[in-house]
């Protein structure tokens, strides 16, 4: 049985690990368009706030360690662009090389994550306005806060990540609204 999983952070990585426990002979390929898999999303604000001091502590698994533990082939920087459900095939873009190829599957699991909502407000694209969804966003926010005298911050969103972001900006001494 050939499983293809789209998305390699929380849901996709958990699905891959569970599949391996259920079927030791399955071929499992996990595609992640980002650079990292299986990282602690809820830890991102705590890295920005300095509670987690070492960036590497955000990562639960690497593609190599995930393969060694679960025999799951992980392809980072690989974006699934098209699904042909009838032919049971996905079209994948290798973001490093720019090449496109197809991968066949017997079963497909979709766990691509979410995109932050950026309301159509004037100035939303200005410098110093961020969204927080992944490690790259975290690096941008931390670099900005480390290199500037940030006088205040506004956090829009009161989910777990928004609340933790407010907590950790406050921890850095930045007044938060």
Positions of PLM-derived features:
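Beta1-alpha1 glycine-rich phosphate/pyrophosphate-binding loop at the start
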Residues: 1-79, 168-177
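FAD-binding core/adjacent interface of flavoenzyme oxidoreductases
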Residues: 1-4, 64-156, 171
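Generic detector of bulky aromatic hydrophobic side chains
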Residues: 9, 40-42, 49, 109, ...
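Residue-level detector of alpha-helix initiation sites
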Residues: 9-14, 35, 114-116, 136, ...
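Residues within well-formed alpha-helices
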Residues: 14-15, 140, 144, 165
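Generic non-transmembrane alpha-helix signal with a bias for helix starts/N-cap capping motifs
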Residues: 59-60, 138, 162
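Glycine/Thr-rich phosphate-binding loops of Rossmann-like dinucleotide-binding domains
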Residues: 118-119, 163-165
């Amino acid at each position: 049985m050939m499983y293809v999983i789209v998305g390699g952070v929380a849901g996709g990585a958990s699905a891959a690990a569970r599949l391996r426990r259920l079927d030791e002979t399955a071929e499992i390929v996990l595609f992640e368009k980002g650079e990292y898999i299986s990282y602690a999303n809820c830890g991102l604000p705590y890295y920005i706030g300095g509670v987690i001091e070492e960036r590497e502590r955000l990562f639960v698994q690497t593609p190599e360690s995930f393969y060694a533990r679960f025999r799951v082939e992980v392809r980072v920087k690989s974006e699934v662009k098209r699904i042909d459900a009838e032919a049971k095939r996905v079209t994948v873009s290798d973001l490093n090389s720019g090449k496109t190829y197809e991968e066949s599957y017997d079963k497909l699991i979709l766990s691509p994550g979410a995109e932050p909502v950026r309301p159509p407000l004037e100035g939303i694209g200005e410098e110093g306005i961020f969204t927080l969804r992944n490690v790259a966003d975290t690096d941008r926010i931390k670099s900005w806060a480390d290199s500037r005298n940030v006088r205040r911050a506004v956090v829009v969103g009161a989910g777990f990540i928004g609340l933790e972001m407010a907590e950790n900006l406050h921890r850095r001494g930045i007044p938060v609204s």
